[in-house]
Amino acid sequence: MAAPRISFVSLGCPKALVDSERIITSLRSEGYEISRKHQGADLVIVNTCGFLDSARNESLANIDEALKKNGKVIVTGCLGADPDVIRQVYPNVLAITGPQAYESVIQAVHTAIPPVHDPFIDLVPPQGIRLTPRHYAYLKISEGCSNRCSFCIIPTLRGNLMSRPISDVLREAEKLVQAGVKELLVISQDTSAYGIDLKYLETPWKDRTVKTKFFDLCRELGNMGIWIRMHYVYPYPHVDDVIEFMAEKKILPYLDIPFQHASPTVLRNMKRPALVKKINRRIEKWRIICPDLTLRSTFIVGFPGETHEDFNILLEWLDEVKIERAGCFKYEAVKGAVANDLGLESIPEEVKENRWHRFMAKQQKISTHLLKKKVGKRLQVLIDESQGKIAKGRSQYDAPEIDGVVHISSRRPLRVGEFVTVKIERSDAYDLYGIAI
């Protein structure tokens, strides 16, 4: 009997991508084949995003496409936390589950298509099924978030912080390293809060016990001999303690910190930490300890009540702090977010657009200036794409998908997943260009 075939669509953030990998790994272990084509598949699973209206619309469009091309659809993910929204538009979907509802998804698949499992065939590699290239992987250390930012509905969709015991995380990391992964990208909703909900539970690891704690996680991952990149790190005071690991090159000198804004007024309205001057002093301290540190962040412009003065404070802050990598979003009202009920004046779309362009122009100048300082240096680069002697890769300063790249010319063919030393010859606003040596 032919194995049942399932088409899979994964939408949204890296956390959702990890959810998709877990579901696919479970399905493959039971004998299901995974396809990228809806036509000819026995059913389609759509892992949705429901954070912004634009993401909800994209999710609904993908459900619509799956129904038209296949007809049998299971919906999971963040949009599934509000099943009525989906049922009102698409009443014929087979099942709807919320985020991280792995077992419910598998049960829904079993109901629609019973598994055909051959116990004599090893269907799944030790590291599980990955949707990223083989040389890097996302390592999700927790679910949910216990913060209550006024613009965000993640706690509603995914619940409060639920950390994985550190021994589980380290076992997964070790398997990935053994499978050939060269870079682990540590992700969660609030990475630096890791373990707080478990009261820093101690668990056995190899010949010792380790605490389920951000510091211990960084220390242990830093001993695995590969690139470790930290994402979604709130600037809590204890983050200071891990900068030393970066200076020692145990983990990459890279911190992804969602600052969101620099105006204390806007930050208070966002229910975010508003001690900007204190954070600035800590950034100065970090850069003294680790001069090679790269900071990446995201910001929101056009938040309700944001004045011209607030926005100018943000631009001045960019000039002062000079974040190496920054992204910017125009504020979108999210259904169910507290920000909708604060009674603050909405910002017109044309004003949001203007502020977004001004932010990006400012950051582009900063990035251009900072990247020029890399010209003439030799950097270790991990190859992401290769066309023989022409390749693209990333240095320690860049995460996949969201940051810049290094364009490489080489005398020999370069392989995806290998490290090469590159002499940087020129730069532009976001990328570097060099020759492999």
Curated annotation (Swiss-Prot):
Needed co-factor(s)? [4Fe-4S] cluster
Entry EC number(s)? 2.8.4.4
Q: Where in the cell is it found?
A: Cytoplasm
Q: Which GO terms describe its cellular component?
A: cytosol
Name the predominant localization. cytoplasm
Keywords (A to Z) from UniProt = 4Fe-4S, Cytoplasm, Iron, Iron-sulfur, Metal-binding, S-adenosyl-L-methionine, Transferase
Amino-acid positions noted as binding [4Fe-4S] cluster 2 in the UniProt annotation, renumbered to this chain: 145, 149, 152
Binding sites annotated in the UniProt record for [4Fe-4S] cluster 1: 13, 49, 78
| Catalysed transformations (reactions) | L-aspartate(89)-[ribosomal protein uS12]-hydrogen + (sulfur carrier)-SH + AH2 + 2 S-adenosyl-L-methionine = 3-methylsulfanyl-L-aspartate(89)-[ribosomal protein uS12]-hydrogen + (sulfur carrier)-H + 5'-deoxyadenosine + L-methionine + A + S-adenosyl-L-homocysteine + 2 H(+)
Protein origin, superkingdom = Bacteria
InterPro entries xrefs: Elp3/MiaA/NifB-like_rSAM, Methylthiotransferase, Methylthiotransferase_CS, Methylthiotransferase_N, Methylthiotransferase_N_sf, NA-bd_OB-fold, Ribosomal_uS12_MeSTrfase_RimO, rSAM
Output the SMART domains linked to this UniProt entry.
Elp3
Q: Which residues form the TRAM domain?
A: 372-437
Q: Which CDD domains match?
A: Radical_SAM
Q: Which residues form the Radical SAM core domain?
A: 131-369
Q: How is the cofactor bound?
A: Binds 2 [4Fe-4S] clusters. One cluster is coordinated with 3 cysteines and an exchangeable S-adenosyl-L-methionine.
List the Gene Ontology MF annotations in alphabetical order.
Answer: 4 iron, 4 sulfur cluster binding; aspartic acid methylthiotransferase activity; metal ion binding; protein methylthiotransferase activity
What residue stretches are annotated with the MTTase N-terminal domain?
Answer: 4-114
Which biological process, per GO, is one annotated for this protein? tRNA modification
Function of the protein: Catalyzes the methylthiolation of an aspartic acid residue of ribosomal protein uS12.
Under PANTHER family, the record lists: RIBOSOMAL PROTEIN S12 METHYLTHIOTRANSFERASE RIMO, RIBOSOMAL PROTEIN US12 METHYLTHIOTRANSFERASE RIMO
By sequence similarity, the record places it as follows:
Belongs to the methylthiotransferase family. RimO subfamily.
Q: What is this protein called?
A: Ribosomal protein uS12 methylthiotransferase RimO
Q: Which organism is it from?
A: Bartonella henselae (strain ATCC 49882 / DSM 28221 / CCUG 30454 / Houston 1) (Rochalimaea henselae)
Q: What is the lineage of its organism?
A: Bacteria, Pseudomonadati, Pseudomonadota, Alphaproteobacteria, Hyphomicrobiales
What gene, per UniProt, encodes this protein?
rimO
